[in-house]
């Protein structure tokens, strides 16, 4: 992105945020006093390497980050324009998924998925789109999908899964892209007739990464034309050939109340080491760049909350009255900025919040043009409506640091 383009984009983002301030008082029922209090129970999410890789397969209903998604409905996964970045047109990358069933019969199994484009350039343009009030066709680089199933369904037993490697799901899944292991492999290599891709982009990347050499060998070893990967066995173990996927973690949960007890200064120091190692070089400059006391106050409250459990990467709310903790006062949505459900027209509520600490575990470089965010807050249909579409679009609000610091 050239300097002039960056400058124009920063000016537009600042103008949009300033225009939104007038709406904030009218629609946002969060005032300074409310920010000091949190009444609703919150569940914290932490990432850890799984003890057993098989535990992250779809039949175990995992909450996980990085790697490839474990599709709840393995057949009818998002396709066509749903799985690409609306800004650059490239397939989105899997960020994380959260298993969050409800008491509703239609949501006995319920999973939310978050995908995003790894390009910071696209995320900045996503900000421009985000500030538009409910466009007819939003252009986003961050997308959220909700999938839910009844207890009796074609894919899983009605009984609790047996946590051993021999437990298998009931039924096959769609054939996936051999490069990303994420999206449907609708495109077939015209030479070997075995390797599948979700897009021309991934086919080119795979060819350059080694399929050019492997393709003739595949033709010799598999002379019968047509892919034979129609069964579940290959699909369930598919991890994708791309080396650019984020590393795979299990998301474990704990109640925030466990961390609300007073900590000694020694414990505070030891518990803060991870976040400080990640942020010391950048947080001071970001803090100094804040415009006015409101941002500094929000940042201080945010840090105080995070310091109780600095390794947390996710905060789960799922309550109509829940409010996320915003690192910055600027760039927050008003109530009017949160759309209504696209399927039932009902209200959406805050489901969970993804913290920037996740980038540390993903090993994302701390460079000027590297992917970065201050917070990603996911809003989902309050009623968790059971529209006929297997994967329903939900809404993500991304707060980045001041545009000037994000660049």
Feature annotation, model-predicted:
Residues 1-407:
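Preference for intrinsically disordered or flexible, low-complexity segments
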């Amino acid at each position: 992105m050239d300097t002039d383009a960056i400058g124009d984009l920063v000016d537009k983002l600042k103008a949009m945020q300033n225009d939104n301030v007038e709406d904030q008082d009218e629609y946002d029922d969060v005032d300074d006093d409310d920010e000091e209090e949190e009444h609703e129970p919150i569940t914290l999410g932490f990432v850890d390497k799984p003890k057993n890789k098989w535990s992250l397969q779809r039949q175990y209903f995992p909450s996980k980050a990085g790697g490839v998604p474990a599709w709840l409905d393995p057949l009818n996964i998002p396709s066509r324009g749903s799985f690409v970045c609306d800004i650059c047109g490239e397939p989105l990358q899997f960020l994380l998924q959260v298993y969050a069933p409800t008491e509703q019969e239609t949501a006995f199994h319920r999973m939310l998925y978050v995908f995003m484009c790894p390009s910071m350039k696209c995320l900045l343009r996503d900000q421009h789109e985000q500030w538009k009030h409910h466009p007819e066709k939003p252009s986003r680089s961050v997308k959220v999908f909700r999938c839910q199933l009844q207890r009796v369904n074609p894919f899983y037993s009605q009984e609790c899964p047996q946590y051993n490697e021999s437990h298998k799901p009931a039924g096959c899944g769609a054939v996936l892209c051999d490069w990303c292991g994420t999206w449907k492999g609708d495109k077939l290599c015209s030479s070997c007739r075995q390797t599948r891709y979700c897009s021309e982009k991934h086919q080119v990347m795979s060819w350059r990464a080694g399929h050019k050499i492997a393709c003739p060998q595949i033709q010799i070893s598999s002379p019968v034309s047509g892919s034979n990967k129609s069964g579940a066995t290959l699909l369930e173990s598919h991890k994708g050939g791309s080396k650019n996927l984020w590393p795979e973690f299990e998301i474990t949960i704990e109640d925030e109340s466990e961390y609300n007890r007073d900590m000694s200064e020694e414990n505070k120091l030891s518990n803060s080491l991870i976040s400080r190692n990640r942020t010391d070089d950048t947080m001071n400059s970001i803090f100094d760049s804040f415009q006015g006391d409101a941002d500094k106050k929000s940042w201080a409250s945010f840090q105080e909350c995070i310091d109780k459990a600095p390794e947390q990467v996710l905060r789960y709310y799922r309550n109509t009255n829940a409010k996320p903790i915003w690192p910055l006062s600027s760039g927050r949505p008003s109530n009017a900025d949160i759309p209504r459900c696209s399927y039932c027209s009902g209200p959406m509520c805050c489901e969970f919040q993804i913290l920037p600490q996740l980038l540390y575990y993903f090993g994302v470089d701390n460079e000027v043009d590297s992917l970065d965010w201050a917070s990603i807050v996911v809003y989902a249909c309050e009623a968790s409506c059971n529209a006929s579409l297997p994967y329903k679009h939900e809404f993500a609000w991304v707060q980045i640091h001041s545009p000037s610091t994000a660049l």
